[in-house]
Curated annotation (Swiss-Prot):
Alphabetized GO MF terms: 1-phosphofructokinase activity; ATP binding
Phylogenetic classification of the source organism: Bacteria, Pseudomonadati, Pseudomonadota, Gammaproteobacteria, Lysobacterales
Keyword Kinase carried by entry: yes
Protein name, per record: 1-phosphofructokinase
Record's GO cellular component terms: cytosol
Active site, renumbered: D260 (proton acceptor)
PANTHER family linked to this entry: 1-PHOSPHOFRUCTOKINASE, 1-PHOSPHOFRUCTOKINASE-RELATED
Known EC number: 2.7.1.56
């Protein structure tokens, strides 16, 4: 089977999860367990797509010092590795989990220092894989040293080849990507309310304001805007229709990776030729629901997604 989707992660991380009874500042602790997982938003998207049965390639930048953690995930899930290797170690994010209170403290360590030459290395890996219609997910933050328009550069490259770019980032990189010419705009974006407010420069306090902001993006050339609204679900907007998709019940536990799973669901909808907005919303929301129920930011099951899709609550925008 030929390649069906690409994800690009410029700032991946190894998630090191340390289990403790209780975290006490200034004290010496004995951990009950520790595990290392390959992480980063695009990596999570690739893993979910692979679980769905898609042939997916992961691109990005990995430090050779600890690339083995990522290589193990790629082998396990059947993900094609097209990551650009550089000297040094990929960053590690510490997650201190307190069993007694079920709380997690995150400590994100500095990442690799990269430059334009490294971004060009990723672009060189990407170029021969691109083709018309191919879903290309550009996801996550930028490491130190890369210019704010790094996603915009890769977005323009993929769009010029006719690929369908799904962009999930925030802050200045999002602003730069959304300033592109109409022909270089992403196919879809998935901001949350706060990220969209940062782009518009003013509060978006209700569904009408969110929908108006989404249509402003569509007027610039984007085909689909998906706005995460937390416990309210997600707002899906196209030029001629909009709807809200909600899970039937609130999930328990960590929401880490739920947004990445939703992006994977959007890519899966493109691959399944889900032409109706409701089909797309059901599948994307079901991916997110299944991720929450699995307890693993990188894991879904096709059976779980199909069951969840039927249970997604679809409503009109008030």
């Amino acid at each position: 089977m030929s390649l069906q989707a690409i994800t690009v992660t410029l700032n991946p991380a190894i998630d090191q999860t340390i289990q403790l009874d209780r975290l006490q500042p200034g004290a010496v602790h004995r951990a009950s367990s520790v595990r290392n997982d390959a992480g980063g938003k695009g990596i999570n998207v690739a893993a979910c797509l692979a679980d769905w049965g898609s042939q997916v390639a992961a691109l990005g930048v990995l430090g050779v010092g600890n690339a083995g953690v990522f290589e193990a995930l790629f082998r396990e899930r059947g993900i094609t590795d097209h990551c650009h290797r550089v000297a040094g170690d990929t960053r590690t994010n510490l997650k201190l989990v307190e069993a007694q209170v079920n709380e997690t403290t995150d400590i994100n360590l500095p990442g690799l220092q990269l430059g334009q030459a490294h971004l060009q290395g990723v672009a060189d890996h990407l170029a021969p894989l691109l083709r018309a219609g191919l879903p290309v997910v550009l996801s996550g933050s930028l490491p130190a040293g890369l210019p704010e328009d790094s996603w915009a550069q890769l977005q323009a490259q993929a769009s010029a080849a006719g690929a369908r770019v799904l962009l999930d980032t925030s802050g200045a990189p999002l602003v730069a990507a959304l300033a592109a010419a109409p022909v270089a705009m992403p196919y879809a974006v998935k901001p949350n309310r706060h990220e969209l407010e940062a782009w518009t420069g003013h509060p978006l306090g209700d569904h009408a304001a969110l929908t108006a902001a989404a249509h402003a993006l569509i007027a610039r050339g984007i085909q689909l805007v998906v706005i995460s609204m937390g416990t309210e679900g997600a707002l899906f907007v196209q030029r001629d229709q909009q709807l809200i998709a909600r899970p039937p019940r609130l999930a328990q536990g960590s929401s880490v990776g739920a947004g990445d799973a939703m992006v994977a669901g959007l890519a899966a909808a493109l691959l399944d030729d889900a032409t109706e907005l409701e089909q797309c919303a059901r599948l994307a929301t079901a991916f997110s629901m299944c991720r929450l129920e699995s307890g693993d930011a990188r894991r879904i099951t096709p059976e779980g997604v199909r069951d969840a899709a039927a249970a997604v609550v679809i409503g009109a925008v008030p």
